[in-house]
Amino acid sequence: MSVSQAMRRLVAATVVAGSCAGPAQAAGGAPQDLPSVVPESAGVDSAPLVRLSEWLRHDRMDVRSLVVVKDGKIVFERYGDGLTRDNNYELYSVTKTITALLAGILDGEGKLGPSTKVAPLIAAARPDLASELADKQDIELRHLMSMSSGLRYTTREGTDPLYYDAPDRLRVAVTSRAAQPPGTHFDYIDVNPVLVGTAVSIAAQVPEDAFARQRLFEPLGFAHYRWSGADGTGAVAGGWGLRLRAVDMAKIGMLLLDNGRWNGRQIVPAGWIRQMTTPSPAADDYGYYCWIHHVVEHGTPEFGAMGFKGQFITVLPAQRAVVVMTSLLPTDGGLRDATYLNLYRRMVGDYILPALTPARPPVESAAATQALRDELARSRQTKGVPGTAAAFNDAPEI
């Protein structure tokens, strides 16, 4: 089958997928969630977690969900403003990490790889864009995923056609211009994941969101998920728009922690996970759509995903732990020092890590368990104050 024929099949599949899009359950008909346990039974001290929740509640931070997993078990699951486990949230750039995992699945099948030249692949599927892709022939998949493509794109705040009501997002993305040699300069721009998501769809011969459902979301037992923001062609963006429950975000963290394995099954090649979580030549804190040593200081190994306004999946390998947060926190500051990032750094460094690494083995007690239960109940009844303006996509859904 030619690439152009594959693209025609892909467009047809996109229409079909769009007609049945919506929240989904696991193949067995019910979500397969991680087990929940009393923190002390997993060697975790609940007292710092109670203090963390009290701080968030006292300062009325708009933290919608905060989940801590230790050794594959949920030890802390906090929701605000009446929200529950069933709610999903706009993940913003955490979506990019999912796209990298999908590329890894295709790498394991020999359909994509770090050195794949993306422009020729797209041009063969979209001949109408060949002229715009002519200056991008040397850009490889790894350059796009490490934000070192060398492309330059100027975003029009609030009205950019890459984000808002795009009739054909890919057509907008390819108008970016090659400004630096690929692999030499880090520049965090959102045309990169649009190109990667397109490559994933072409290589998989189904739309990216359908491939994600088949090869990642259903095997991990996701529920109540949605990939929003499709453009006029029906294609989702590879860098934003995915909505997941916090407990399903935690499963992504566990997949990364366990080198691509889930319940004994290799979902993503282990070698790909290692590449994702290894710094690229262009940035010592960024791999394949994965931040590295970005949250925790003092040399503690850590990597994960970060999204605008305070969406996080953080993996702590030494503690065999995963931390997840969804929020609407202040966005002032830069990519590496945003207020939401600094607040999250304090949460992890001052409260969560001490809970995971107590000075002495914690003792399970009825009093400690009740104190945690009471604080979580108070948190669910507390409405946080948004730290930044809420957009149309920021409302939690079910």
Please state what every model-predicted region is.
Residues 53-84, 313-314, 320-324:
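A short, well-structured edge-of-sheet supersecondary motif
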Residues 11-21:
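Bacterial N-terminal signal peptides
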